[in-house]
């Protein structure tokens, strides 16, 4: 469904939607939360009696949840080890190295890790538009064994620490978002962009 926002701005600084912004996020400042919040997606603009109207498609919680479920693969590590090779991901219960539950992962999907643990790359990985998401309040150890990772980036939850002992692909940029901490333990051949949280460079 469509909504409408009316902007009235008598200040010198003007930051309004213009033609070409369709599809971009529309934000409002929430005085109670004291931060900018997403209210929807910009659909179009019009001018009525000197006021600019911005038409938006309202944020839809149900649809967003369905999209996240469709384009993510959830793995509950629960302190255990997981190995990733090509499209296979194997969870080793009780930190066993040889046996485990194997699942298929799909390119262009996010992998969501929960409850802390260890991740071992056994191949050069290309997630396409997919990234790696780590939940809140846990520690994760990522070991690349000389293999590289390429994808949309890393999202680290609040009070989580990700010890990154892996290589990011040199033809990509490591994007790090989320309030958690990325502890980079290996010298990288790629650039890094930080959207939020902390990054520790140890080499």
Can you say where each PLM-predicted feature lies in the sequence?
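Tryptophan-centered short beta-strand motifs
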Residues: 35-38, 95-102, 142
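A short acidic/small-residue loop/turn micro-motif
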Residues: 46-47, 189-191, 203
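Chymotrypsin/trypsin-fold serine protease catalytic domain
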Residues: 1-14
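Glycine- and acidic-residue-biased ligand/ion/polar-headgroup-sensing regions
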Residues: 87, 180, 194-199
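Surface-exposed loop/turn motifs in large extracellular/passenger domains
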Residues: 31-35, 170-173, 190-193
């Amino acid at each position: 469904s469509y909504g409408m926002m009316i902007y009235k701005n008598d200040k010198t600084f003007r930051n309004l939607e213009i033609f070409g912004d369709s599809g971009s996020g529309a934000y409002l400042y929430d005085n109670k939360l004291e931060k900018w919040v997403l209210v929807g997606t910009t659909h179009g603009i019009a001018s009525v009696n000197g006021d600019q109207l911005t038409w938006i498609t309202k944020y839809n919680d149900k649809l967003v949840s369905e999209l996240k479920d469709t384009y993510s693969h959830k793995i509950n590590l629960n302190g255990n080890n997981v190995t990733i090779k090509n499209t296979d991901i194997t969870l080793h219960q009780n930190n066993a190295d040889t046996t485990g539950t194997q699942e298929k992962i799909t390119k262009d999907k996010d992998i969501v890790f929960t409850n802390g643990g260890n991740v071992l790359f056994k191949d050069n990985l290309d997630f396409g538009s997919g990234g790696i998401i780590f939940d809140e309040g846990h520690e994760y150890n990522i070991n690349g064994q000389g293999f590289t990772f390429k994808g949309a980036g890393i999202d680290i939850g609040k009070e989580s620490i990700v010890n990154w002992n892996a290589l990011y692909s040199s033809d990509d940029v490591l994007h790090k978002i989320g309030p958690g901490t990325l502890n980079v333990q290996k010298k990288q051949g790629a650039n890094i962009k930080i959207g939020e949280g902390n990054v520790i460079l140890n080499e």
